[in-house]
Amino acid sequence: MDLEKLKKDTQVIIDDVIKQTEIKAGQVFVLGLSSSEVNGGLIGHASSSEIGQVIVSVIHKTLSDKGIYLAVQACEHLNRALLIEEELAEKKDWEIVSVIPQLHAGGSGQVAAYQLFKSPVEVEHIVANAGLDIGDTSIGMHVKHVQIPVRPILRELGGAHVTALKSRPKLIGGERARYK
């Protein structure tokens, strides 16, 4: 795998997704990542620390520079828990759980984020404003309603399918209501 190309493609994708989702400083962005799929394998069967490190580093720096919080989803072995900064967990009053991610229990993305974050903690439930799914990891459970699919400018990263979600407030009130 060409890690320089992976880095450049990740940057193109995250810049495009930020633009399309219109996520703002102070909001939460969830990342689901299968380095196995990026590597051309089956999800959970060809994990790569290097791939996880490259992708998460690019996304973390880009979001941090804009004041956006990153939440990295774990694999199903950790019940899709999320690695976030402790500051965010305290701000949102999200319950912290105890586990340290490993390559095959949490995944390469969480391991990379654990090393990059200032004070990483795991939580089981969040409500993110938008997110990026690299490798069909099913991030929808973590994005608030109403979710709207976003098609990134690049639809594949390595061998992985790439999609994203943004959210909008629910439209309530029926035929008499007016909306922006």
Curated annotation (Swiss-Prot):
Signal peptide: none annotated. Transmembrane segments: none annotated. InterPro entries: Antibiotic_NAT-like, DUF436. Belongs to the UPF0340 family. HAMAP family: UPF0340. This is UPF0340 protein LL0489. It comes from Lactococcus lactis subsp. lactis (strain IL1403) (Streptococcus lactis).
